[in-house]
Structures are given as C-alpha cells and as structure tokens.
C-alpha cells in the first residue's frame, strides 16, 4: 500500500459563469521518503489538487470525485473532524507566501505553541520548548528569544523557516510545499530547498513539491508530474522528464528554460498562445490549440499511457514514439537536456 495514492481525482467548482474543471482526472502516488515534484503553469490545478488532499476545497459549490488514499484510508469519505486530525498530524502544508500565512498581530512563539497544542496534550511550557526546538531545527539562531518576535521582525527567508517549523510540529508523514520559494530571492531559495531536503532525510517524510519552476525540482525531486489545464500530461522520474521528455508541453517548458551551456545571446523558445479557460477547456487534448504538432486525432482525449519499454514513464499524447523521436531530432537541443555521461 502506497503512503498516499490519488486515483482519478476530479475537482469541479460550480460558479455563476459555469463549472470550472480545476482538476480533471489526476492520478499519482507518493511513497515514504520520496519527493514528488508537480510542475505546471499558474492555474493548471496543481495547488487545488493538493489542497483537496487536505480537505481544504470542500464546499457546497465544489464537486469532488475519485479517491485519496492515505495508507489505504479514503480521505474523501472522511468527516471534518477526521480531516482536522489528518491535517498537521499526518499531512502538513507550507504555503507560498509566509507573510500572509503568519498572523501579523501574534508573536511567532504564540502561533507555534498553538499549533503544538492543537494536536498534543502538553502544557504551555512544554509546547513552548517544542516550538524553540523546531525553530532551532530549521536554522533560526537564538531560537528561544526569537519566539517573542512578531512576523514583521523576521526576514522573508526566516518567515518561511518559521512556516516549515510550524508544519513539522507533529512530525507529519507527508509535507506538501506549495511554491515554497516564490517570494524569496535566489540565494534564500537554495537555502530553503536544501533545508527541506535535509529535514526530509532526517525525519523520513515524503515531500510533494509544487512549483512552476523546473529549476526548483531539478535538484530535489525523485519523480515529476507535469500538469496542464487540470490534467497530468507527463509523469516519470527526474531523469526521464529532463533527459527524455515525451509530451510537447514538456518540450516547451524545457525549451523556455535558460541554460548555462547555451550562448547568452540565444533567444529562448516560447510556447505560443495562452492556457485555456477551465470553464470551457478544448475538446480532446487540452494542449491542442497551442501544440505545433496537432493533428485530427488530438480532438479525442488521449489516455495517460506508459511509454513503450518504460512502464513508469507516462505521457498523454497521440503522437507515436517514432513521430516523437523524429520531432526531437528536427528540433535538436531545444528539447530535453543532454544526458550525463555514463
């Protein structure tokens, strides 16, 4: 049994303008100690899928189908009280903007103590000691005294470290990191990603890393799901996605990334067009209107199938393996990275 398994998840929001198909049949799994990267443009459904895992999208106007199995137990069928126990205890989440995630009027220590006592029957002193221990664990110096600081007295990187500490108060089995480095400068981004990796190795938890930046997952993920317009269009190991991509959307993402092995004067390629409205997604393949390789069959919805000879490498495209090989030769090094020497 997988630690977490998502089966054909659909999340549709009923609005005045129509039904928004935010997640349209996503399936994936996460094992203990693994890091899964979920990559895609803003609005592709990656955050909605993971907020649904935590039960944060439930409302009278939300239609949720499929199964979310945590060690075999279906969270979609769980009651609100049961989900409250799951949040923080089994699965924790770091949100992308720590400034808005922390309450500006309460000290960091008060917020951490509250998180500890929400799931543990401990005294306020014990909870405060645990809070100081966690701040020290995430690399904040003089942790005991910094508990009495307000969020605005922390730098952006320190606020994100405090959010990571809050997520770890109950030693969760799974940590969901939703764009954890978006609001940080490049140097601090690297520190936060390294911290998450270090904590994962120390605590043995699984990590789901949500991002629009391929560079973020390049050094951290074991597996990658590429999402587009509510659907997973390609899934595989880190090496499969970076060195042997199979879906035209993945080709476009990789081609638009600046690389140190290319001349600085070379123009980056771009994906033409705009992401579709999830109120009225295109018929068949959702990437069809932007794909330079579209043909008639693309008006039918392609399945997420294994690539021939590689069972764990899946892609949602009607192009045959031979056609993909030909297109990659024609487009040259704009698609994928050069495989490392053996």
Spans of features found by a protein language model:
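Conserved ABC ATPase signature
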Residues: 149-154, 158
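A short, proline-enriched helix->beta-strand linker immediately N-terminal to the Walker B motif
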Residues: 169-173
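Charged, flexible cofactor/metal-binding loops and thiol motifs
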Residues: 237-342
């Amino acid at each position: 049994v997988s630690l977490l398994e998502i089966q054909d998840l659909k999340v549709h929001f009923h609005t005045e303008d129509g039904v928004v198909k935010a997640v349209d049949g996503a399936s994936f799994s996460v094992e203990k100690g693994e890091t899964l990267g979920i990559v895609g443009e803003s609005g592709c459904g990656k955050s909605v899928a993971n907020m649904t895992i935590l039960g944060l999208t439930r409302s009278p106007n939300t239609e949720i189908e499929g199964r979310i199995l945590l060690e075999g137990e279906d969270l979609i069928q769980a009651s609100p009280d049961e989900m409250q126990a799951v949040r923080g205890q089994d699965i924790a989440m770091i949100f992308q903007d720590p400034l808005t995630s922390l309450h500006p009027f309460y000290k960091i220590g008060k917020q951490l103590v509250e998180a500890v006592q929400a799931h543990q029957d401990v005294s306020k002193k014990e909870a405060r000691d645990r809070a100081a221990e966690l701040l020290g664990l995430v690399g904040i110096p003089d942790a005991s005294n910094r508990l009495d600081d307000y969020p605005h007295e922390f730098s952006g990187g320190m606020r994100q470290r405090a959010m990571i500490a809050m997520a770890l108060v109950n030693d969760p089995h799974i940590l969901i990191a939703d764009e954890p480095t978006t609001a940080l400068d490049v140097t601090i981004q690297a520190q936060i990603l390294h911290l998450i990796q270090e904590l994962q190795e120390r605590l043995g938890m699984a990590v789901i890393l949500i991002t629009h930046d391929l560079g973020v997952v390049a050094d951290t993920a074991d597996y990658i799901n590429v999402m587009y317009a509510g659907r997973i269009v390609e899934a595989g190991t880190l090496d499969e996605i970076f060195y042997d991509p199979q879906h035209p959307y993945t080709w476009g993402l990789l081609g638009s990334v600046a690389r140190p092995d290319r001349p600085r004067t070379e123009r980056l390629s771009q994906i033409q067009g705009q992401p579709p409205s999830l109120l009225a997604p295109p018929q068949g393949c959702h990437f069809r209107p932007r794909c330079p390789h579209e043909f008639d069959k693309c008006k039918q919805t392609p399945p997420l199938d294994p690539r021939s000879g590689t069972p764990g490498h899946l892609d949602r495209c009607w192009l045959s393996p031979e056609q993909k090989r030909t297109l990659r030769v024609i487009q040259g090094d704009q698609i994928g990275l050069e495989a490392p020497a053996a």
